[in-house]
Amino acid sequence: MVSSLPKESQAELQLFQNEINAANPSDFLQFSANYFNKRLEQQRAFLKAREPEFKAKNIVLFPEPEESFSRPQSAQSQSRSRSSVMFKSPFVNEDPHSNVFKSGFNLDPHEQDTHQQAQEEQQHTREKTSTPPLPMHFNAQRRTSVSGETLQPNNFDDWTPDHYKEKSEQQLQRLEKSIRNNFLFNKLDSDSKRLVINCLEEKSVPKGATIIKQGDQGDYFYVVEKGTVDFYVNDNKVNSSGPGSSFGELALMYNSPRAATVVATSDCLLWALDRLTFRKILLGSSFKKRLMYDDLLKSMPVLKSLTTYDRAKLADALDTKIYQPGETIIREGDQGENFYLIEYGAVDVSKKGQGVINKLKDHDYFGEVALLNDLPRQATVTATKRTKVATLGKSGFQRLLGPAVDVLKLNDPTRH
């Protein structure tokens, strides 16, 4: 989908990717929101500075908002509608200046604005009825802020997704393969990823139908099961794709205008996921992950100096891996990239010429020596029974362990 975008958009995404690589955010969604909000402010400042120049060419950079209504409204209700447009999220509707300005997101789910949640619930309800939504045009003078949904993850245990339907094993495998490398799903655990797949809604689309239209408000992400689609930007065909591909990812992050028009070039079977469902799954997964890892982190003496907030941030950055008996986790001499915390299981630590020098079990840790001293791995670690570990990458090790790093240095066996 990225390759179907104009070069300017690809350049913007590359800048974003560079920021991600540099910051390695534990909360990707909030980092993204903050980043694009800043970029939008930069764009508005650029346009404002050049407003006289464009006025001289009869180009209106900051038009007054207009509205189209499917039914008459009173003056009072029209006033309310205008007010809502003026203060909506900057990512809701199409930006008419996308061709004028060319470019050269730490989230606490309990501290989000309720306004966007209400809007999303209303939109979700409208889609199930025959009454069409009221189209609103972009207003460039509105305040540039990003609203988030107020989603209470501790209430998710009783939540049932609207479109939940168990998929067959074959469907699960195909759909999992389709979303495996998508950056939005990389941090989901296997249970949450399976829930996402089972929440995908089947949609049949005939040949020639427009699936999404450039500039329209985006609420759905799509996976192509059967058929082929073409992508158009400004009426120019830029790409094609078929079974196993996906598009519309940005719609799951925020109300983003569609970057391209997608047309079915054959009869298609698609799977669709709406943004509200995805965000509930994502935040629910993060909340459960924090709860699960909090007990583990509190039980480890080396991490006792971390505050509750520090533990929460660390939990968000941890990944889980399972190793079977006899499987090598790290090998002596290899480059060290991860720090390991044993959730359960047992491992042997061995060195060449010395054999097994240590045995580790539940709530022990290893892999810190190479990261503390920027050295190759000093020993081989092998699972002796089924072992589940929480892993932390090198950048997260340096950023998130804080005062615990000093304790790790005191316990570093290479310094004794």
From Swiss-Prot:
Q: Does the keyword Zinc apply?
A: no
Name the residue ranges of motif: Inhibitor sequence (IS). 142-146
A GO CC annotation recorded here is: nucleus
Pfam families referenced in this protein's UniProt entry, alphabetically: cNMP_binding, RIIa
Task: Indicate which residues the UniProt annotation says bind 3',5'-cyclic AMP 1.
Answer: 184-301
Q: Which residues carry this modification: Phosphoserine?
A: S3, S4, S9, S68, S70, S74, S77, S79, S81, S83, S84, S130, S145, S147
Positions annotated to bind 3',5'-cyclic AMP 2:
302-416
Q: Which compartments does it reside in?
A: Cytoplasm; Nucleus
Mind listing the UniProt keywords for this protein, alphabetically?
A: cAMP, cAMP-binding, Cytoplasm, Nucleotide-binding, Nucleus, Phosphoprotein, Repeat
Region Disordered: list its residue ranges.
Answer: 65-138
One GO BP annotation of this record: regulation of cytoplasmic mRNA processing body assembly
Tell whether Hydrolase is among the UniProt keywords.
Answer: no
Instruction: Please state the span of the N-terminal signal peptide per the UniProt entry.
Output: none
**PTM info:** Phosphorylated by YAK1 in response to glucose starvation. Phosphorylated by MCK1 at Thr-129 upon TOR complex 1 (TORC1) inhibition. Thr-129 phosphorylation activates BCY1 to inhibit PKA. TORC1 inhibits phosphorylation of RxxS/T sites but has no effect on Ser-145 phosphorylation. The phosphorylation sites can be clustered in several groups, all localized in the N-terminal part. The first cluster termed cluster I (CI) is located close to the N-terminus and includes Ser-3, Ser-4 and Ser-9. The second includes Ser-68, Ser-70, Ser-74, Ser-77, Ser-79, Ser-81, Ser-83, and Ser-84.
Instruction: Spell out the note in the miscellaneous section.
Output: Present with 4280 molecules/cell in log phase SD medium.
Mind telling me which PANTHER family this protein's record contains? CAMP-DEPENDENT PROTEIN KINASE REGULATORY CHAIN (PTHR11635), CAMP-DEPENDENT PROTEIN KINASE TYPE I REGULATORY SUBUNIT-RELATED (PTHR11635:SF152)
Q: What is this protein identified as?
A: cAMP-dependent protein kinase regulatory subunit
